[in-house]
Amino acid sequence: MSTGTVVQVIGAVVDVEFPQDAVPQVYDALKITGEGSCNGLVLEVQQQLGGGVVRTIAMGTSDGLRRGLEVVNSGSPISVPVGTATLGRIMNVLGDPIDEAGAIGEEERYVIHRSAPSYEEQSNTTELLETGIKVIDLVCPFAKGGKVGLFGGAGVGKTVNMMELINNIAKAHSGLSVFAGVGERTREGNDFYYEMKDSGVLDKVAMVYGQMNEPPGNRLRVALTGLTMAEKFRDEGRDVLLFVDNIYRYTLAGTEVSALLGRMPSAVGYQPTLAEEMGVLQERITSTKTGSITSVQAVYVPADDLTDPSPATTFAHLDATVVLSRQIASLGIYPAVDPLDSTSRQLDPLVVGQEHYDVANGVQTVLQRYKELKDIIAILGMDELSDEDKMTVSRARKIERFLSQPFHVAEVFTGSPGKYVSLKDTIRGFKGILSGEFDHIPEQAFYMVGSIDEAVEKANKKK
């Protein structure tokens, strides 16, 4: 183990000088030794500048760091605990416990920089994963072992949707989950921990947090820490759920690190290595012949612009995209999923079956027609429409309201109990609305209910 000294500190970027014959490799973890608040601070090598000097990024706060401090090279990249010992625990980017519940007591550690599985090892599956959320199961069904993105601007419900998915899938699926909190609010991490504890699934979840107040190096690597833990479970032959909230903060941390390292920015100020950094992470989130990783990633959309380079780069890697719309949220329809913008590779008659495909297609057709008629209604009013168009509008408004659903995780705010709707009930409900079976029921009855039977019951009560 070679030792060096700190020669320059600029914020989170630290230059360290080593003897010429013992220069650390890129991604090696270095540790600061000696007195003071920085004792034990981990640095990750990013560049070799020549002359024995390496440029590193600090994985913690660099307050109190000064020139001349001694640095020890660990000789390998950052490694984190893996295996069942991590379940029920909250860890940071280095795998250290931050839940005040003692040491992890792991039997094995993995380095966080690993290569993706080869083509021969990867498996292809078309098994569906039921979420219990009507709009998702109908329009953008998830595949087991697939990648899902929840796209949305600020405050349209990405985290609430993700919490509901964890609540529904983690409980029903009874598999293991890994939650990586990347650059999000500490309060949300705290809420998530107690939510899991109260629902009794804490012993099946490993949590890794690198919150908003952490330095960029920490936020850039915390997603890899969570992924490494999920990979271990997958390689043991288990089916794992990996939740990442929020993948945009991973990109943003990369932008900060890139700027600190002096790289020339690319479009909209993002790092020139954006596509490669995203690829390195996403290519590792895959299912092998041994086990599967099903990942759900929240993607913040800056200024609600889906063409922004960050969400646009993420799109390419996903099997299903759930787009949350501010317009739908403003109508009071939650989850605010846009059924016309959301997509899934699984929505294919060969995968979901002909009936499901036809119903989903019918719902989208009716909603699209209603969207086109909105301008005419705004100018001329409903009376000018043909009888057929009036029928379309009436059914579309019922469908819109029926796409809403009370969530278990939002019971505290809404006061109404959450509903889990099976795929069979979802298809039956929408098929009935499209066929005109429920034309006699007022549209208000479809708002915030679970299955179609509840809507009928609600309408009968109002009579």
Swiss-Prot record:
Topology in membrane: Peripheral membrane protein
Binding-site residues for ATP, renumbered to this chain: 152-159
Coiled-coil parts of chain: none
InterPro entries referenced in this protein's UniProt entry, alphabetically: AAA+_ATPase, ATP-synt_VA_C, ATP_synth_F1_bsu, ATPase_a/bsu_AS, ATPase_alpha/beta_chains, ATPase_F1/V1/A1_a/bsu_N, ATPase_F1/V1/A1_a/bsu_N_sf, ATPase_F1/V1/A1_a/bsu_nucl-bd
Catalytic activity field: ATP + H2O + 4 H(+)(in) = ADP + phosphate + 5 H(+)(out)
GO molecular function terms listed in the Swiss-Prot or TrEMBL record: ATP binding; ATP hydrolysis activity; proton-transporting ATP synthase activity, rotational mechanism
EC number of this enzyme: 7.1.2.2
Name of the protein this chain belongs to: ATP synthase subunit beta
Source organism per UniProt: Shewanella sp. (strain ANA-3)
Gene for this chain: atpD
